[in-house]
Amino acid sequence: MSNNIGKVVQVIGPVVDIKFANDELPNIFNAIHIKMDDGKILVCEVEQHVGDDIVRTIAMEATEGLRRGVEAVDTGAPISVPVGECVLGRIFNVLGKPLDSGAEVNNEEKYPIHRPAPSFEEQSVVPQMFETGIKVIDLLAPYQRGGKIGLFGGAGVGKTVLIQELINNIAKEHGGLSVFTGVGERSREGNDLYYEMMESGVIKNTALVFGQMNEPPGARMRVALTGLTMAEYFRDQGQDVLLFIDNIFRFSQAGSEVSALLGRIPSAVGYQPTLATEMGALQERITSTTHGSITSVQAVYVPADDLTDPAPATTFNHLDAKTVLSRSIAEIGIYPAVDPLDSSSRILDPRVVGEEHYEVASKVKHILERYKELQDIIAILGVDELADEDKLIVARARRIQKFLSQPFTVAEQFTGMQGRYVPIKETIRGFKEILEGKHDNVPESAFLFVGTIEEVLEKARTMAQ
């Protein structure tokens, strides 16, 4: 730590102004340590040089009890957090301090949370599909290795279970690791997630980082970078890492909270003028390199369901795929409740996934769209009034809809059904056979909550006995 000492001259909520000697102003993003009267160390981050040898900083913790005249020490470096195997199975805050009841992490290896994005030479330019083992995602809205996925869904439609299954699958099938970052999260949800992960056994392959809803905006604004930094270390070690950010909207929201206090003139809808820059700095670091990959799943809250709001609109620019969870699908008992028509992916392209995959996915979507159109007629007149061709479409669409369901490993204790990981080849083969009419005589209920098409036939034989 440097001997550069300044004094607090102004405190406005989370924004603290500190005066230093003329020739020793700390750099932008440097961490400043302020010793409070109760002995605690308050960490602030330099955001601006405002003139008269004063730097404007954002506090990462509550500023209650802070007063003018207190000494502030420039650490000479940005906030640094522990990285490596020691973070797995643990919960951290924005500063890399443990929040669980475990031991202190005295890891020598630390990374600064502000790091440049990988250079063009380091980045992997070949788009590759990332197999999740979840049929509906792999077939209709496949994830890109090193891509960014938006997860849209309201309360109670299965976001958390889907997140846990992805963590479980990447750990078991790919030997990969996960970092979960709660940005502006409810403490209760973070608590629930931790204990559910402990029960399902995936916690040992996961690091959890939280900046909760009740924390100052500085912590909520930087906690996404803390989680990303931990993920970057594993990527650089050659791992495939899954990074969850819940919720990416809160990252923008926290930035707008401090923006006015930093003296910036608000932009559209009151957001910070630097919204696109801040989002870009975060998102550009989430990428594949020649060593490994970070695949990011980001929950996106849409204020007042307005997709043109600057915060979600800025996020959309960076997404490669979107997975939409639908309440109407959850209500008919199909889980995961992924909407097959609303969900989409940039890499659902024959040049990336192959001709067969693309063709099967297109036909599945076409049949489901036609079934949706016919539902109004069925509701008024009944199925019997349809033309024979449409009756066949309805029969196959219902089988497809049910076959898109799947038992999850992390939900075994609730469902009593053993979880299934379905390789993409099996997924394509199963749906192709349904489209070709090979299973038109198999009862619809046999397609519900199974893995491969063989299991459908086995289930049908059991039902017939």
Swiss-Prot record:
Membrane topology: Peripheral membrane protein
Localization in the cell: Cell membrane
Role description: Produces ATP from ADP in the presence of a proton gradient across the membrane. The catalytic sites are hosted primarily by the beta subunits.
Catalytic activity: ATP + H2O + 4 H(+)(in) = ADP + phosphate + 5 H(+)(out)
Oxidoreductase found in the keyword field: no
Protein name in UniProt: ATP synthase subunit beta
Organism of origin: Clostridium perfringens (strain SM101 / Type A)
Residues at which ATP binds: G153, G154, A155, G156, V157, G158, K159, T160
Domain of life of the native organism: Bacteria
